[in-house]
């Protein structure tokens, strides 16, 4: 990891400013984030939908929701590569999937750690630092001293945003549909007496409307969590001071070079003057 390659302004921030920086990172890196994110998320979702028997379509939403830790690993990989100015294509993201699945603690994240509210802050320890066991626990405890509560609230806020957006879209549909036919389709997943064709489309709309909202919100969540992690690293390891000293050293080298050149020119000029 080369601090000189970082593409964002590293300085000490409070936790909420760090989260705001993460949101700005999504806007700045969107060309690198969304092509791969869109391809992987929606191709997996559509494959799962069409392979699932009609009687079990209701569970597609649950499976997609449960696999959030997998998607977070993809997003963190993209953000970490972009942060350090590493060239990245969609093919690079796809080729990294086997390692992201097997080398980042995904099994734990999908089982007994699934409901951790600080999973976004903890993920870089697993994925980027590759720490395990006692070293991971000590590192996590240290990072949590000043960022844990903000990481938890970020998780809660993003989860609420997803459902607020979902219910807002449903409410909008109800308001603009004078026939109530769309409403009948939308509520069919929760009606055991609904006709099968109606229920099929109701489940499809519900699942992929939520997926669209998740497609928007989750990069914000992961970038905010990653920025929290970076801010704690900056606090603990004084990245901002190190970068400031490096910048100062670069400027001094430039000044020294120009000063030396000026002295040489002056010396040559004086020598020529006296020889004449």
Regions found by a protein language model. Name each.
Residues 1-276:
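Hydrophobic alpha-helical membrane segments
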């Amino acid at each position: 990891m080369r601090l000189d390659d970082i593409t964002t302004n590293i300085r000490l921030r409070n936790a909420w400013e760090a989260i705001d920086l993460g949101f700005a990172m999504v806007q700045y890196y969107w060309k690198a984030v969304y092509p791969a994110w869109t391809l992987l998320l929606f191709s997996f979702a559509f494959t799962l939908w069409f392979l699932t028997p009609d009687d079990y379509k209701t569970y597609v939403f649950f499976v997609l929701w449960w696999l959030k830790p997998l998607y977070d690993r993809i997003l963190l990989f993209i953000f970490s590569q972009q942060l350090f100015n590493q060239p990245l294509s969609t093919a690079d993201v796809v080729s990294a999937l086997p390692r992201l699945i097997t080398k980042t603690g995904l099994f734990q994240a999908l089982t007994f750690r699934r409901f951790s509210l600080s999973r976004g802050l903890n993920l870089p320890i697993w994925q980027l630092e590759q720490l395990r066991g006692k070293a991971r626990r000590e590192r996590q405890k240290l990072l949590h001293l000043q960022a844990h509560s903000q990481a938890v609230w970020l998780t809660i806020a993003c989860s609420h945003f997803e459902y607020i957006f979902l219910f807002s879209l449903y409410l909008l549909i109800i308001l603009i549909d004078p026939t109530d036919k769309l409403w009948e389709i939308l509520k069919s997943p929760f009606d055991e007496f609904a006709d099968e064709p109606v229920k099929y489309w109701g489940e499809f709309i519900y699942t992929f409307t939520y997926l669209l909202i998740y497609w928007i919100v989750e990069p914000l969540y992961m970038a905010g969590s990653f920025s929290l992690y970076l801010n704690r690293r900056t606090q603990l390891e004084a990245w901002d001071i190190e970068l400031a000293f490096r910048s100062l050293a670069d400027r001094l080298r430039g000044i020294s070079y120009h000063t030396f050149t000026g002295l040489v020119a002056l010396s040559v000029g004086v020598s020529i003057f006296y020889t004449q």
